[in-house]
Amino acid sequence: MAKDKKTNPESKKSFPTAFFFLLFGVIFGVVTVQNFFSAKKASVGFSHQLEHLVNLKLLIPEESRKTALNDNLVSFSGRFREVVPAEGQVRYQYLDLIERKHQIDFELEEASKSLTVLSKEVRNAITWFSAISGMPIPEAGYTISPRTDVGLSVLEPLVVYGPVDAQIVNLAALENRVRSLPKSTESLRVFGSDLYALIGKYLSPALGIGSESLKKEIKDLHQQVENSLTQVIEGDQAVALYKTVLETLHRISLALVSPEEGTRFHQLRSVRLYREDFNRCVKLLRESDETQVQLDKLRGELVQAVWYFNNQELSSRALEKQDPEVFSRWFEGAKQEWAAFSSNKSLSFRAPDQPRNLVLEKTFRSEEPTPHYSGYLFTFMPIILVLLFIYFIFSRQVKGMNGSAMSFGKSPARLLAKGQNKVTFADVAGIEEAKEELVEIVDFLKNPTKFTSLGGRIPKGILLIGAPGTGKTLIAKAVAGEADRPFFSIAGSDFVEMFVGVGASRIRDMFEQAKRNAPCIIFIDEIDAVGRHRGAGIGGGHDEREQTLNQLLVEMDGFGTNEGVILMAATNRPDVLDKALLRPGRFDRRVVVNLPDIKGRFEILAVHAKRIKLDPTVDLMAVARSTPGASGADLENLLNEAALLAARKDRTAVTAVEVAEARDKVLYGKERRSLEMDAQEKKTTAYHESGHAIVGLCVEHSDPVDKVTIIPRGLSLGATHFLPEKNKLSYWKKELYDQLAVLMGGRAAEQIFLGDVSSGAQQDIAQATKIVRSMICEWGMSDHLGTVAYDEHSEAAPTGYGSYHEKNYSEETAKVIDNELKTLLDAAYQRALDIINSHKEELELMTQMLIEFETLDSKDVKEIMDHSWDADKKRARMKEEGMLYKKISEDLPPPPPQENVQDGTSLKFNTST
């Protein structure tokens, strides 16, 4: 019975999953039905649309109803016809004709205004022509357009009258003067100036010749006269020229006066434009008469018609007299409703809460309002269902793991019970000092009385400090596994929630659970999420995170040594932790988990290599030496990548080739073989990397060259890898000078062999500059500046932001530092040039081999330097490495039978391995 009482409430609290599927189905069904009904409605929603629908007879009158809501608003409904009746088509044609008539009248009015303006321009142009040509206007005048009768309308003629202005120097006067023109220079100059001015008047906009051929001919005459005025021409030659020009002008004048296409002065722009507008007016008048005839005919058919226009009831004649602009805007709505009829036909519509108008009062039948409960149901049901769904989801979240709302403040720490933790110190390698620090904790958990009997106090808290991936969490689990005690694990971010007080409640609950399972270990990973400095946040020291931290401080200082609870925490940001959290009595011991050295990396690789099938020839010590700065997680990932690469190549064991490739992938990035590099780019990269390798092999204090490659990885097009022989604990001056020469080797090789330099040495120059600046300003290795530290770096601020660089020396000292910096870099570059000049043959050979093989290992580089290089041996070695541990397919087909065919030949097959 006790078991039933315990389990039945849990079964009642669990909500059936089928309910949620049913809930989603109901919501989907309601929305679908609403969309179905709304999609079948016609697009009528405003009362002003009804004027056009009623005028064009598009609605069924018997189904047009309205329901009064108050004195101003009504709801109306109706249905469209299946086809437009004949009367509706006649009505629409009538409205369209009225709109066309208004448009024609407007265009005709604009054309008439244009004719008035152009007629004035024509008179001015012809009068000006008569004045400059000396040709008098006839008494009857020049007729540009005759009187024209178009139906009942008349277009008045355009006749130009006017006397000639005798004061203007004209063509006729110059023709008379040239007959008795003296041949003196002054007389010729005066006559030429008058002729030049006359030709300019022919080209003036006042005349406005529109023919391009005539204008070009007149411009040529203008240029000839201008040349005669600027050049020295004999008298007879000048007179002959002027006579020719006058004859040409006379001919042009006669051509302008001569009728063309039935019109004089047709070559003038103003006359041509006038004729175009005149013809346009004639055309518009004819269209107006035709439209008026059609309107009269349709008006006879619609004598009894009633039109609803802007809330007015009008006859057909009254509709025609409406303002054209107002009618045009109103007719746009009629056109839209007429065009929409094809999609609205046979459909019903309903529009609620619309203002009353005349068409509703006259044509729609009134009815009493009826309640639509189904409409209310469809309207509010989706809202109710969504609110219910949100309520149930929220209630399930609040219930948490234990099925009650009060469990929201319970600790989410995961308990690894006694006997379940299989991790021991045997699984931890490379951090021996940290393991030694934690041996006492293991002894306490196994035998607490050993320490308390002597009056000693066991550390209440242990803080593991180290970079990411160094094994802080792993060593904490190893402590619990070695002592075989319960292990509570939780992340620092699990304490902070959106509800106030939840974090502090979880802290209290976690320590209560730990006391019940004492002796045990509580491990808080990434404690900096909850243990940051107080008072630095936006909440001014009173936010939820700080309340959680306060509760943690109280709990850590509140339990005694006899309770057997040890708190372990891990962080990679000890600088941001609150000082009260770090004081003795809370975290008594700080264990620094450093990045492993060469020996540590070898031990870590050996631990992870136990579960990987490695080729016995794989040198784990060489891998450890080639991965400086790698954490335990990096090394584990390296071996895992090597195993994946070997499996991809169908090998039965992981060889040194896969390990080296995985190391490069983890540390430097994946090969970018898809990057297109032309032959010149490959050659440049090969010279650059060969320069690094040659200088590195020739200097005394450089690490051995491990590999040279021109395969792009990450952001680099190539790389030269060095294999450190020992841990780098300090830097020596001679070593740094050699390292600077190695860094400058790539740029020096480009300068010597290519005669130019590229941007590929950007990282080399930046790294060399950083080293030299540290030598001068931090390590006191400059002969000129002495053993003085010129750079200061501040400690990290309490807010958690990084340190900053402070300059505390004068501008003159800065100049000396810059000069010394340039001197050392120039010396390193010159040293690299000297080394490469003395090993040109080896560098050229290494470059050629890099272009062919793309990668050279340490053995290849040594053979090139020893002049014992053999490319065939390299190819054979690469082929042997490629076939090493290759899987042999078990599904090979049997060999084909050797049967003779009719022509006496045997069947032969190509085989490949």
From Swiss-Prot:
PROSITE patterns: AAA. The active site is at E689. CDD domains: RecA-like_FtsH (cd19501). Residues 101-913 are annotated as: ATP-dependent zinc metalloprotease FtsH. Residues 1-16, 395-913 are cytoplasmic. One of its GO terms (cellular component) is plasma membrane. Acts as a processive, ATP-dependent zinc metallopeptidase for both cytoplasmic and membrane proteins. Plays a role in the quality control of integral membrane proteins. This is ATP-dependent zinc metalloprotease FtsH. The gene is ftsH.
